[in-house]
């Protein structure tokens, strides 16, 4: 047992990455992979079973808990943004250096790409059998929607853009409130569960129009995978070239969320007064000295 532990420790030292930003990028990649793998896996079950193994609620629950798990995995290493819109907001507020925006975005997109690949491999036979050995993007036998978001038939481009804008702005406002130490902060260790709850609420209230991507990496990574895996370029042209909306709109929504929170809450918060416990300690100390 001692030799085995020594060997494990030695291997760990050899594999240890000393460049902090690279360690953080790997954490973002894995966290986003977990998010997409569990989230898209729930969509796959619903679509491929034609609704017999879940529904809209189970998809939202899966994405909410997937976000929680992703944050628990990556949180202590990278902050677990798992979303370029969140990274953009943190850089915009000068809470993170701007160099992290391209690095995190690339890592998050790669993680989403790999997560989609895992689900494709897991449900490979079911996907091919679903539409008689065809990979169809949209329609009753479409399977591309397992991986990326597409607009509903009633949705035009302007309404769809607004949908993603509001969804992301809402997400950013809630995230900023959760991580703000001066605004009734969430107890340590519960941040991941609270953010997961936010995603669940957004999904159950704003998911009808286009599936609430509110995350450029979560949408583009799997979309790119489907284009390579066999669905082809149609994944970029369907829905009047919808693919760019879940990329651009969330970034603009991120800025809006930052301004709304800062203008209405963040700029007006004051540091909490010293705790009564500290005051009591000081007062008791003074009395003790006077008695002496």
Swiss-Prot record:
The chain crosses the membrane at residues 25-42, 57-74, 101-121, 160-177, 190-206, 243-264. The record marks 63, 212, 218 as: Selectivity filter. GO terms for biological process: cellular response to hypoxia; establishment of localization in cell; glycerol transmembrane transport; odontogenesis; polyol transmembrane transport; positive regulation of immune system process; renal water absorption; response to ischemia. Its main location: membrane. The keyword Protease does not apply. It is found in: Cell membrane; Basolateral cell membrane. It is a multi-pass membrane protein. A motif (NPA 2) lies at residues 215-217. Aquaporins contain two tandem repeats each containing three membrane-spanning domains and a pore-forming loop with the signature motif Asn-Pro-Ala (NPA). Homotetramer; each monomer provides an independent glycerol/water pore. Could also exist in other oligomeric states. Aquaglyceroporins form homotetrameric transmembrane channels, with each monomer independently mediating glycerol and water transport across the plasma membrane along their osmotic gradient. Could also be permeable to urea. Also participates in cell permeability to H2O2 and H2O2-mediated signaling. In skin, transports glycerol to the epidermis and stratum corneum, where it maintains hydration, elasticity, and supports lipid biosynthesis for barrier repair. In kidney, contributes to the reabsorption of water, helping the body maintain proper fluid balance. This is Aquaporin-3. It comes from Bos taurus.
């Amino acid at each position: 047992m001692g030799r085995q532990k020594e060997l494990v420790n030695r291997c760990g030292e050899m594999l240890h990455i000393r460049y902090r930003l690279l360690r953080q990028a790997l954490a973002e990649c894995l966290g986003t992979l977990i998010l997409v793998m569990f989230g898209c896996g729930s969509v796959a079950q619903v679509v491929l079973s034609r609704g017999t193994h879940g529904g809209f609620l189970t998809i939202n629950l899966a994405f909410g808990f997937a976000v929680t798990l992703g944050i628990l995995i990556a949180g202590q290493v990278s902050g677990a943004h798992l979303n370029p819109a969140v990274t953009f907001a943190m850089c915009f507020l000068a809470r993170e250096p701007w160099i992290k925006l391209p690095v995190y975005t690339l890592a998050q997109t790669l993680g989403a790409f790999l997560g989609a690949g895992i689900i494709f491999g897991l449900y490979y036979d079911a996907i091919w059998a679903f539409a008689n050995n065809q990979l169809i993007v949209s329609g009753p036998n479409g399977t591309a929607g397992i991986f990326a978001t597409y607009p509903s038939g009633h949705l035009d481009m302007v309404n769809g853009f607004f949908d993603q804008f509001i969804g992301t702005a809402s997400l950013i406002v809630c995230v900023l409130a959760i991580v703000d130490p001066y605004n009734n902060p969430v107890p340590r260790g519960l941040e991941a569960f609270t953010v997961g709850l936010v995603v669940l609420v957004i999904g159950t209230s704003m998911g009808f129009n286009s599936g609430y991507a509110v995350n450029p990496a979560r949408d583009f990574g799997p979309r790119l995978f489907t284009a390579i895996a066999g669905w082809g370029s149609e994944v970029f042209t369907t829905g009047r070239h919808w693919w760019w909306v879940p990329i651009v709109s969330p970034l603009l929504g991120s800025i809006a969320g930052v301004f709304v929170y800062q203008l209405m809450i963040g700029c007006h918060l004051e540091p909490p007064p010293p705790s009564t416990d500290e005051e009591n300690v000081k007062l008791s100390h003074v009395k003790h000295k006077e008695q002496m």
